[in-house]
């Protein structure tokens, strides 16, 4: 017979910290080359013009410019960076 009564509940009481995923720079925001635009798991949003993708699917700006989100087709979104003089 067990000499301890069911006291195992604290072993299951852990959780992992949030991963801080999501959009970091929104549409029409100015970005510098190298700025992270989206952190994501998988290609929820695809890279468009002047946007690079890291090995963890992070999207980042390749040039200075303004962020533009658009639809690639019905189910896919993409993000691009539009260059130009914007006074920043």
From Swiss-Prot:
PROSITE patterns xref list: RIBOSOMAL_L27
InterPro entries: Ribosomal_bL27 (IPR001684), Ribosomal_bL27_CS (IPR018261)
Protein origin, superkingdom: Bacteria
Pfam families in UniProt: Ribosomal_L27
GO biological process: translation
Gene Ontology terms, MF aspect: structural constituent of ribosome
Keywords noted in UniProt: Ribonucleoprotein, Ribosomal protein
Annotated GO CC locations: cytosolic large ribosomal subunit
Region feature (Disordered): 1-21
Disulfide bridge partners, by residue number: none
Family per similarity comment: Belongs to the bacterial ribosomal protein bL27 family.
Entry protein name: Large ribosomal subunit protein bL27
Source species: Helicobacter pylori (strain J99 / ATCC 700824)
